[in-house]
From Swiss-Prot:
SUPFAM superfamilies: AbrB/MazE/MraZ-like. One of its GO terms (molecular function) is DNA-binding transcription factor activity. GO terms for biological process: negative regulation of DNA-templated transcription initiation. This is Transcriptional regulator MraZ. It comes from Dictyoglomus turgidum (strain DSM 6724 / Z-1310). Coiled coil: none annotated. The keyword Transcription applies. Forms oligomers. One of its GO terms (cellular component) is nucleoid. The gene is mraZ. HAMAP family: MraZ.
Amino acid sequence: MFVGEYYHSLDEKGRLIVPNNFRQLLGETFYLTRGFERCLNIYTITDWNNFSEIISSFSPTDDLMRRLCRFWFSGSVQVTTDKLGRILIPSFLIDYAELYKDVVIIGAGRHIEIWAKERWEEFNKEENILESMKEINEKVSELWKR
């Protein structure tokens, strides 16, 4: 499981250091893709392949799934860390997530998320979190009852 929150900066070439404890779980090569809240997601090769198989198995006549496939596959790249533990983030992903300098790398369970620092701070404003937590807690409570 990926856990924790790390503050880093993108260098002028678009490279980012992946925290060592994350690299140990990811290996040298993994997938980087667009996330749903204008962040980037990192997946292990295994999880990437599993999710890709699931979304590819839906009917090609399903408009919603075609849209998801386009979003998922067109916005993804396989990356490999260099000897310093950095990855090169392509410019189209930097622009998508607005990662122009300071970033926050967070563990999100089975995947990692990379956020622009300002967007992460806005997302985590206390009133936003507290508002969402009630609804989230209700959903989790329902799962525990099963």
